[in-house]
Amino acid sequence: MNKTTDAAFRETVARHGDRPFLCVPSDPARGYHQDGYEIDYANAAGAVDELIARYRDAGYGHGHRVAVALENRPEHCLHKLALNALGISCVPINPDYRPAEIAYLLDHCEADLILHLDSNADSLRAAMSEISRDVPMIEASKFADGPPAAKRPAPIAGPVTPQSEASLLYTSGTTGRPKGCILSHQYELMSGAWYADLGGLMALEPGAERVYNPLPLYHVNSGIVSFFGMLLTGGCQ
């Protein structure tokens, strides 16, 4: 897996463009996509390209880190792919974190931007009041207008590589401070390939499978392993 996540995504788009990529079942009691949501690979690629343009135009690039607080919404996955395409690391925020824990994460990862929902804006602002850094914020529903301009140039010169940082995942912090785990593009794709190659009851037929994963996208299982397992095989999560 000597490629970037964007390269892997584009390869699957070319092979399985009309196949479903992300799906959310209908649920009238849920606060979003009550009627359900589904997007195929080709349309997802178009959505990702639009996000890439917004991030790039605002000056975000290789080596920046964006804290993402979108809970388990499919938009999280689209933003992650867009961020990674530019060499930006995706730093998911556990929605159950208390303000002090969020403050630690934002300060420790040196976030360059916070992408959030309207519903979690207050907790994020409370967290921001506990640190000395001023991190720009953008509500997801307003992202089409573009995020605030980056406060510093892209830290890394040169193209995105398989060794570039793709995600920075934080542990639950139950026994101490949450610990940040750096995952490269190569690591994430290899994790997905491992999942796709398990076989047996877990055999994934290219372009034919769906996985229902109720686990949180800030966790490595749903956000990385099964996500890239399906992406690499043209499946749907």
PLM regions and their residue ranges:
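A short N-terminal helical cap/helix-turn-helix that marks the beginning
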Residues: 1-27, 46, 166
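Conserved pre-ATP/AMP-binding loop-to-beta segment of ANL
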Residues: 2, 17-20, 151-170, 176-177, ...
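Conserved AMP-binding/adenylation subdomain of ANL enzymes
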Residues: 189-210, 218-237
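Conserved AMP-binding/adenylate-forming core of the ANL superfamily
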Residues: 22-73, 77-81, 98-103
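Conserved AMP-binding A3 loop
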Residues: 37-42, 166-193
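ANL superfamily adenylate-forming
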Residues: 26-37, 119-162, 177-178, 189
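Conserved ATP-dependent adenylate/AMP-binding module captured primarily in the ANL superfamily
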Residues: 97-127, 146-150, 191-212
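A short helix-loop-beta submotif of the ANL/AMP-binding
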Residues: 65, 71-91, 95-99, 108-113, ...
